[in-house]
Amino acid sequence: MGVYNTLALESGGITGPEMFAPGEVVVDENGRMTGLLKETACTYMWDKVIYTEEEFMKSFKAANDILLSYGVTSMHDGSFYGEETIGLYQEACRSRLIKVRMYNLLYHAYGKKKTIEWVNRFISTGIHGGLGDDHFRLGHVKILIDGSTSGPSCATTEPYSHDPNLKGIQLYTQEEADDIIIKAHNAGFNVSAHAVGDAAVNVILTSIERAMAQNPRPCRHRIEHCGIINEELLARIKKAGIVPIPNPGFFNENAEIYVKYYGDRVNYMFPLKSYLDNGIIAALGSDSPVIEADPMIGLYGAMTRSDKCSGTVAGQGQCIGIMDAIRMYTYNGAYASLEEDIKGSIEPGKLADLVVLSENILETPVEKIKSVKADMTVIDGEIVYER
């Protein structure tokens, strides 16, 4: 989400809430725009700002340096920012301006219409996911089904606990999701979707199930966030072999408001313990820049699910231990990008990507995990960061 003044709204051509899905352009009691834009209304405005190649490259370098300082050696990037950025990303990785290995989801950050056009163009080329090398790879086709847990704007089947009139924002109908997901699946792509609320998770699950029924083939589809689910959705995720990508670091920032917004549903929110108990391979991510990219925040969130300000715990029964959390960040992350044969664990024959931490996190008290630092980051056997 983002806040824009009157001049920015006028310059961007946003004239009223009717231009987008209900709830994306926030209005006051008199129906006037407040300046708060959510989801595709917000990303629509991103397209109105033009960056130079030099500005892009500077931002790539800055992001790379931040990730290396956190000990991150591989990342999954959720979107491209305009057609020109795919080539810039590739060049930055080729020249090693970006040293962190990049697995890129095929999603256009400037909204639904752009994403559909973007995905159709990739499908029409005849290529499919996995194109690239160990430093820059094109991966899953991705769409964005709903909003966020913190908005709150994720699409839920039941109203929010704090407001019986709200059930979030759903950006794709079932038919629209079916069209793009089945098309991408048939073209040989693995598919993914940003789906947070249980209503949104049901949409993407249904599309994937229909795609797999029409065209059974080896695949490794995934759901980004997969925030609020239930036993029925959990069983369907397992049956389809889907990889959920939960973000436990969110609890560090939002556990208190999660309890307010979703009530007892927090017991199946980013349900890491349930994934483990059911043999579902889930990979943890930060969702940076929504929160910091520091994996220590995610590890802490996975183990405590507690709010850093109030101490509120959201769904304590879903807490997991340190070794399981580490595996979800490392091996499972590689599994989510179909690269577990070359990275995700330290063993002979795999890429020499390592991090040396300031202390042994297997012995560090849970309450101190967030203070652990990366002392050294190594990629391809080269020291790329030292504290």
What residues fall within each predicted segment?
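Divalent metal-binding segments
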Residues: 1-123, 139, 143-200, 219-220, ...
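Acidic (Asp/Glu)-rich catalytic clusters
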Residues: 92-96, 126-133, 213-216, 237-241
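Short secondary-structure transition/capping segments
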Residues: 5, 10-16, 117-128, 150-157, ...
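Non-cysteine beta-strand/loop elements that form the S-adenosyl-L-methionine
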Residues: 135-153, 240-251
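Short, well-ordered loop/turn elements at secondary-structure boundaries
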Residues: 98, 132, 137-139, 145, ...
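His/Asp/Glu-enriched, well-ordered alpha-helical/loop segment
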Residues: 58, 181-192, 196-221, 225-226, ...
